[in-house]
Amino acid sequence: MNTKLNDFKKKIKNKKVAVLGIGISHTPLISYLYRLGADITAFDKADEVKLKSTLEQFKGMDIKYSLGEGYLDNLKGFDILFRTPGMRYDIPEILAAKEEGTEVTSEMEVFFELCPAEIFAVTGSDGKTTTTTLIYNMLKEQGYKCWLGGNIGIPLLSKIEEIKDTDKVVLELSSFQLHTMTKSPNVAVVTNVSPNHLDVHKSMEEYVSAKKNIFRYQSAEDRLVLNFDNDITREFAGEAKGDVVYFSRKTVLEKGAMLKDDMLVFRDGETETEIAKASDIVIPGVHNVENFLAATAAVIDCVDRDVIRKVATTFTGVEHRIELVREINGVKFYNDSIASSPTRTIAGLNSFKDKVILIAGGYDKKIPYDALGPVIAEKVKCLVLIGQTAPKIEKVLRDETERSGKGSDIPIKKCTSLEEAVKVAYRFASVGDVVILSPASASFDMFKNFEERGNRFKEIVNSIEA
């Protein structure tokens, strides 16, 4: 019996509960808390018209709403407040509620308190979703009952009564979710850390500190998987309480998952096990080799080597990640909409042997783009720019040309929409070319999220007449 869950049910019944944000994760949360007998008020900055289809799901439930402009004005008198991950924990309204005695938490924080199963969790600036999905697939292929959640999969708190202590839970966690966490998973994976989300985090130091919460509360029995090739994550080992296992594409390790020639290998002291050939991995790019190494290090104690090998050679990737959309008259179109940072776009560009036509630009997260300039100069034959960050990306290429003389012959096309960008890219392309949407920027200046951006790109490409 899950006594913690029973205690939570008693605690929540008849309590005044505020849920901030009526998004994908909070829709099932609201329904679940209502079933437990909570007195719920749901808050959202969107108005009733924009939320119409979502609110219809709560028809027949006695739920109160505070919507639109000034929606947080009445955040008073609540026992418990569930914060959406994208909202900072220290805004004045939340601080005032805490001062009044309201318990402030989040869906993920409560889930960690109640979950009876072993938790594998992944964070990092890039590669989170692919690595999380790989771990999930490896565990599932081994025969475990698995649950996939966090940033992907389903909101798991509403499923907590179905999760058994013999199951495995696999989570993708962002810095926003981790920021206020006071529990860590049994197995924590940090794929890499580079500047990101500095439009929300007050500094790089705050961003890194949030990431550290994935292992900060571990015990000696837990495992921390770190990228040895990343300067920031390598240093995390000094603060770890549990068993540290590295992965590396560039270095031979005493203990960990590594690439030796073309072979993915796991070494533990004198024992070395060959897992799979890197050339057999279906999805392209050296960054995906790193993702496989990270996943291998996470599951090596509970998944057979042949199972890991099978997943390595059959996994075809995740949508919006160097996803081949279509080939038209010898021109291949790839959707890499997930690339919301320069490091992610660099990895995407390095996945191709020949120069590509790059569509880039979008919402400005206030992060540096300097590292992107040399890679564009080396790997791009035409640069098509859209969105707020277009001037930044153009500048780093021009700076690189001034510094090294490279990239001076790359045409730069500025467009006002994704539709125009695709048309311009296709007009420039010839047989054998690759056109890739890899924005190096978030999507919020034009789209709700990277999925909507990627889906729109696919719609545009699929509407082109051959």
Swiss-Prot record:
GO terms for biological process: cell division; cell wall organization; peptidoglycan biosynthetic process; regulation of cell shape. It comes from the Bacteria. ATP binds at G124, S125, D126, G127, K128, T129, T130. SUPFAM superfamilies: MurCD N-terminal domain, MurD-like peptide ligases, catalytic domain, MurD-like peptide ligases, peptide-binding domain. Keywords: ATP-binding, Cell cycle, Cell division, Cell shape, Cell wall biogenesis/degradation, Cytoplasm, Ligase, Nucleotide-binding, Peptidoglycan synthesis. It catalyses: UDP-N-acetyl-alpha-D-muramoyl-L-alanine + D-glutamate + ATP = UDP-N-acetyl-alpha-D-muramoyl-L-alanyl-D-glutamate + ADP + phosphate + H(+). One of its GO terms (molecular function) is ATP binding. Its EC number is 6.3.2.9. It is an enzyme of class 6 (ligase). It is found in: Cytoplasm. InterPro entries: Mur-like_cat_sf (IPR036565), Mur_ligase_C (IPR004101), Mur_ligase_C_dom_sf (IPR036615), Mur_ligase_cen (IPR013221), MurD (IPR005762). Transmembrane segments: none annotated. Cell wall formation. Catalyzes the addition of glutamate to the nucleotide precursor UDP-N-acetylmuramoyl-L-alanine (UMA). Belongs to the MurCDEF family. This is UDP-N-acetylmuramoylalanine--D-glutamate ligase.
